[in-house]
């Protein structure tokens, strides 16, 4: 939910091909990659079918800037820009979600659009990670009375290894009534289980393959998606 993408990708590419060091001596790290998924699943909803989801990012000394996109078979596509800072297990960040569809304008943050800015706070304890997200600008959602809801979502996730496969289990909920997540009050809207395994393609090359089973207890929906990462 892209204008700055060309400039951003150029910066990332330049960083990959020429060693850059920040003034404090810490190298700037860059990464670029993509996922290909059978369904685009997000927070208890299926947003799209098969999709190509590229990402590019820079990180220096805990400060990161990244762009992520999703483009499927429909006319709509999504671009998310994230600025975040992490230290220890603590992370704070802001994400701009931009849904590009017919008639949409990037600088339009009115409540009637799908354009939205979200702030997040999180802490990774190792065995368990906690994250809180709140819509703060644009499509913030409405309460049943018509007031701004500042729709929020919090999630508890836990990684583990079983049978030689990396797993992650997560449960997410929205804490109060809002039409953004379609909740009339506190509601658990996402319960997911994701498995990831490296598949060897030769002696020195492998790709991660992952599968996600996601349920939405509130809407009584169940989704399944598989994907590969490059």
Regions found by a protein language model. Give the residues of each.
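Cleavable N-terminal export/targeting peptides
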Residues: 1-29
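Transmembrane beta-strand segments that form the barrel wall of outer-membrane beta-barrel proteins
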Residues: 32-40, 61-73, 90-104, 127-138, ...
């Amino acid at each position: 939910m892209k204008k700055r993408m060309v400039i951003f990708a150029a910066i990332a590419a330049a960083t990959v091909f020429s060693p850059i060091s920040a003034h404090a001596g810490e190298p700037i790290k860059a990464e670029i990659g993509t996922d290909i998924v059978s369904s685009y699943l997000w927070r208890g909803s299926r947003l799209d079918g098969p999709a190509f989801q590229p990402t590019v990012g820079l990180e220096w000394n805990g400060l990161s800037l990244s762009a992520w996109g999703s483009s499927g078979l429909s006319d709509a596509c999504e671009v998310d820009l994230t600025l975040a800072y992490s230290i220890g297990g603590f992370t704070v960040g802001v994400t701009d979600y931009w849904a590009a569809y017919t008639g949409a304008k990037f600088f339009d943050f009115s409540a009637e659009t799908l354009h939205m800015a979200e702030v997040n706070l999180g802490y990774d304890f190792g065995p368990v990670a906690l994250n809180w997200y709140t819509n703060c600008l644009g499509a913030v959602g409405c309460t049943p009375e018509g007031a701004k809801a500042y729709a929020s979502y919090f999630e508890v996730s836990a990684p583990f290894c079983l049978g030689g496969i990396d797993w992650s289990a997560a449960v997410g909920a929205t804490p109060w009534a809002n039409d953004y997540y379609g909740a009339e009050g506190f509601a658990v809207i996402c319960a997911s289980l994701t498995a990831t395994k490296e598949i060897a393609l030769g002696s020195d090359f492998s790709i991660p393959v992952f599968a996600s089973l996601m349920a939405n207890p509130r809407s009584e929906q169940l989704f399944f998606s598989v994907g590969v990462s490059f």
